[in-house]
Amino acid sequence: MPVLHNRISNDALKAKMLAESEPRTTISFYKYFHIADPKVTRDALYQLFTALNVFGRVYLAHEGINAQISVPASNVETFRAQLYAFDPALEGLRLNIALDDDGKSFWVLRMKVRDRIVADGIDDPHFDASNVGEYLQAAEVNAMLDDPDALFIDMRNHYEYEVGHFENALEIPADTFREQLPKAVEMMQAHKDKKIVMYCTGGIRCEKASAWMKHNGFNKVWHIEGGIIEYARKARDQGLPVRFIGKNFVFDERMGERISDEIIAHCHQCGAPCDSHTNCKNDGCHLLFIQCPVCAEKYKGCCSEICCEESALPPDEQRRRRAGRENGNKIFNKSRGRLNTTLGIPDPTE
């Protein structure tokens, strides 16, 4: 059977999604379990998702599934039932429902087979990814935040940490998850007697990170079940204080969910308080950066005067300038480590 995929242009699909009158629900989920033939599973799931008008990004590998999707509100329960029935390993799977959702997170379904559902760079044959740390629920998270023997480790990238994080959480400065894993072990060597609490957006990265820490001799390891999304939802439902500060970066068109009223980041151009990510409008750049409304107007959505000038050129001249240029204009640091541009929304598996 040929590989199933979308054949309609992105512009047409986006216009169709924006014209929809039915509300949509943004959902994320993951599951580490053995998939014997990811390609066969991919095609079967593609047909199931397409029949229910599901959009989003789904990765499959022998180690499991990782998905961020948008489902028509009227199809959510049908989707849940069919997903649970698809494989015994998926029965009862936790679905993280978006907190701050306009239903415009995705407009196309992209489903890919990869070597890993999270690019971890681990090649140790003795590593047991199932030997994970203990789960923490919302009330337990708050208790740990008040425990002087606990250290919270943020297993997200710098651009995610920059706009929001737990109180006093430690950032592991790196551009990718695979770079963070060895760095986390190195940074925590002097704190093996502490309680290590790991977290990420929806749980997939911190779950594997907790197993990696245990593999490297850390015995007191926890991770937040369902990540920031599930913590904030459960804390609100249970009337608990929400101790996450700022915005939770998400890997779709929204680029963020408001968790608290505090704005802890700043515009990369003028320094004003701001936590709104955008991609540079220059097609030769598309750098991910933080831009306030004033600078968005001043620079016409671009990251610099150079990009502003280039984006105003005739299309043929823009293409000529882009030819042979591997990266964008590299005005801002994506992380503290090095200059790096990101085309479009970052890949959540990196």
From Swiss-Prot:
Pfam families cross-referenced by the UniProt entry: Rhodanese, Rhodanese_C, UPF0176_N
Positions of the catalytic residues: 200
HAMAP family the UniProt entry points to: TrhO
Keyword annotations: Oxidoreductase, tRNA processing
Gene Ontology BP annotations: tRNA modification
Protein name: tRNA uridine(34) hydroxylase
InterPro entries: Rhodanese-like_dom (IPR001763), Rhodanese-like_dom_sf (IPR036873), Rhodanese_C (IPR022111), TrhO (IPR020936), TRHO_N (IPR040503)
EC number: 1.14.-.-
Function: Catalyzes oxygen-dependent 5-hydroxyuridine (ho5U) modification at position 34 in tRNAs, the first step in 5-carboxymethoxyuridine (cmo5U) biosynthesis. May be part of an alternate pathway, which is able to bypass cmo5U biogenesis in a subset of tRNAs under aerobic conditions.
All copies of domain Rhodanese, residue ranges: 146-240
UniProt record similarity statement: Belongs to the TrhO family.
Keyword NADP appears in the UniProt entry: no
Catalytic activity of the protein: uridine(34) in tRNA + AH2 + O2 = 5-hydroxyuridine(34) in tRNA + A + H2O
Organism name: Escherichia coli O6:H1 (strain CFT073 / ATCC 700928 / UPEC)
Main EC class the enzyme belongs to: oxidoreductase
GO molecular function: oxidoreductase activity, acting on paired donors, with incorporation or reduction of molecular oxygen
